[in-house]
Amino acid sequence: MTSSITPLVAMQGTLEKMADKFKEALPSTMDEWKFISVAKLTLNKNPKLVQADKNSLMQTFMRAAQDGLYLDGKEAAAVQYGNSVQYIPMVEGIIKVLHNSGLIKTICAEVVYENDLFDYELGTAPKITHKPLIIGDRGKPICVYAVAVTTNEGEYYEVMN
């Protein structure tokens, strides 16, 4: 009786064999085995990823490791387009990378709804004022914004609708 190894099991084994490479790529604050465990969970949730181009899949895992992000759908995602897999950092992951850079003091992103009080000014002294409606229907989302303050007290604003 011969046992056949499925492509999913084979790829999970490949991830385990790459533990040293992941350890080298990951920030020192991250454990390579936890990274591999999350990567394997990603494959279990979306087994079609192992049918895609293996090089693009492995590049996705390695890029996530280099950025110090887990492919958990919150920090980053492995998304299949045709036969290739793309590494997509998510908002939570981007914020994590910025915090870990040591260059950002605070950062936030918020959704503004049509019944919130919202005002912003551009120019040499940009300013955002957002007072969410506490009681009642906030309405539909109308825009989002992000604010970042750097460790040298620089302030950056971005409003997107």
Where do the model's predicted regions map?
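Binding-interface segments
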Residues: 4-5, 10, 14-161
